[in-house]
Structures are given as structure tokens and as C-alpha cells.
Amino acid sequence: MPNQINPNLTSWASELDDNALEQALRTSRLPILAGPVCLMADAHFGLGATVGSVVATKNALLPSAVGVDIGCGMVAAETSLTAAELPDDLKALHGLLRDRIPAGVGKGHGRAGTTMTPALVALGLPPGSASELSARQRTTIAVQFGSLGSGNHFVEVCLDERDRVWIVLHSGSRGIGNQLATAHIKTARLVAQEENQVLEDRDLAWLTEGRPEFDAYVSDMLWAQRYAWGNREQMMDAALAALRSVAPHAVETQRINCHHNYAVKENHGGEEVWSPARVPSGPVARTWASSRAQWERRRSSCAGRAVRCRTSPARMVPAVGSVARLRSAS
């Protein structure tokens, strides 16, 4: 059962440190809330809004509630293989994954001109900031598309309860998503001064619907979400190709690709609200209660946060249900 900390704050967190709790309490006092702040099972301290929280707002958006890795999420592909059909020695697969999926801080593919896939060409540039992008940022967009990144991002070959082989991947919008988010959070601070927003934390500054700064953020956020989705798709294609190199009869049977750092405008009880979610990795299902009293949620824990291993770039580490994991540098 959730813990109702106050009328505007509900927590499902089994462990919540004092810093994260104080941060969530500050968020719960914002005047733009459309419902209570909800903390997920492993919520923890972050920039402005708590990582592992859902913060629904009305007529405004809170960039820090979306997070600095806009569109970060998971993609999982089920294959026709079972554990018994995998090679006994997975070193070759590990090497292929390392070669085909760049991992680590700032890592990407070669030169920009060699990485302009049709998906990337169709994506274009972030519309809210296109005129302000430097040549280096434009290059970063190209060379980092199809790369893992750092922190708790990973690609993993694992097994389900039927011993069916899956590939699971965790990544987001890479350097450009972080840069866009950081720039818009700074803009929100300036807007807060203009609007005389009363803030307990300047990183809880919001953008009011109808302002040009709001429109610019939404357009860039949606672009970064598409970039992150495509980034995961490209890496998953590369990972499956690597798997087929060691198991040629492997067939992809289904794929699930979803964000967990995002915002979407939804209608609840006849009222339009923005639902930013800055939540750890894992499946999530949410429904808005008819009384608009709270968000209900059922979800798994974060991807590698609570039980993370500090490893060198792209080193295999064991995980529950895992055959092999390619882990980015922490």
C-alpha cells in the first residue's frame, strides 16, 4: 500500500532518504500541480524534481520533472532462441556488441557524414533550438545516434521464465538531449524571475503554457523523445545482427520500445493536464483515479541503480536472469 505523506504527495518507495523526501515535499508544494506528486518504488534525489516521480501539472510544464536525459527509456526484443541454442562461449557475441554499439561518456560512431541514416535525416534538428545549435552540437547529433552512453545504460542478453532469449537495452537522447534539457531548465529560471514565481528550489521553475519559451521546450522535448526512440531502435538492430552472427537462425518475435523520461498532454476527467514522468527503468501502467486524487502505478525497479556495479566500459557483468551484459562506464 502507498504511503500518503501529505495530500499532495504519495509514495510507493520502500526506502527514501531524507534528501529525496525533502525534495519531493518541495515539489508537492508547487501551485501548478494537477494532482499529487507520486514517488515510484525506488525514488531518489535528482536535479529539481525527484528521480522516480510523476508530477502532473496544469497549464505549465516542469522541465526538471522530465529530466536531463529526455526520452531515456528501454527497448526489449524477444527472439526465437532458447538458452540451449546459445553458444557455450559468449565471448564472440560480447566482442561484436562492443564493436557495433559505442559505449561510454561522449562516445559515438565515426564522422557525421558516415552516420546519416534515413531515420536521422527524417528527424532533422530540434525545432525549438535549431537556430542556436553550434556546429559541434550538429555533429554530436549525428555521431551519437546509435550509441549507448554512460551511467546505468546497458545492453543485455537475458532469459525470461521460459528460457527464451531477449535483448534488453537502456539508453536515451545522448549528449544533445542533455544539452537541450539543461538549456531549457536555465530558461525556466529566467521565466520564473519574470513571473515572480515563488520557488523553494530554482530548479523547480516551470514554463507557463502560452509563452514562447514553453512552445520551444515542448517542440525540443518531443524531438529529443523521437531521437531517443530512434537511437534505441538503431542499437537494437545492431545487437540483433550481432546475435545472428553467432546464432544465424535467431528471429526477432516482438519488440517493445518505451520512454520513462517524457511528458505528454492528457485528458483526465475532462481536464487537460501535462504528465511529466521522470521514472527509473521498467514497465509502468498508470490510470488517473476518477476523483483525480492520485496516480496509481505498478512498476519494477530502476535499471541498475540500486544494485549497480562500477565497471570498466563495456565489461560483462552478471545480472538476475542475464546471460551477458554490456555495461557503459559509470
List each model region and its residues:
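A generic, well-ordered mixed alpha/beta core segment in the N-terminal half of proteins
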Residues: 65-128
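Acidic active-site catalytic centers that drive phospho-/nucleotidyl reactions
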Residues: 41-42, 69
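Domain-length cofactor-binding catalytic modules of enzymes
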Residues: 2-23, 32-39, 45-51, 55, ...
